[in-house]
């Protein structure tokens, strides 16, 4: 094996091991977060439904009261509902991407 090949293989090995050494910590912390969220969902699945209902009522109340700005005062019921549904879809998409 030539010295150049040996050097390049050594450098490649160093880079790979450094990268691999950083990942387990990230994966471990991510795994802990996923496990804690899964266990909390398993322990209280009803709370998730209640949370969504609460968020929906809160969002509609804020839209009716005009707490989200001047444009929301002029919004029709259909626009309010579409806006809420888009917001919930984005949240679900973000949750799916986090998994």
Swiss-Prot record:
Where does the signal peptide begin and end?
Answer: 1-21
User: What are the subcellular locations of this protein?
Assistant: Secreted, Extracellular space
Q: Which GO terms describe its cellular component?
A: extracellular region
Check the record and name the InterPro entries matching this protein: Svs4/5/6
How is this protein induced? Answer: By testosterone.
Where on the tree of life does the source sit, at the highest rank?
A: Eukaryota
Tissue specificity comment: Testis.
The record, for PANTHER family, names: SEMINAL VESICLE SECRETORY PROTEIN 6, SEMINAL VESICLE SECRETORY PROTEIN 6-RELATED
The record's similarity note reads:
Belongs to the SVP2/SVP5/SVP6 family.
Protein name per the record = Seminal vesicle secretory protein 6
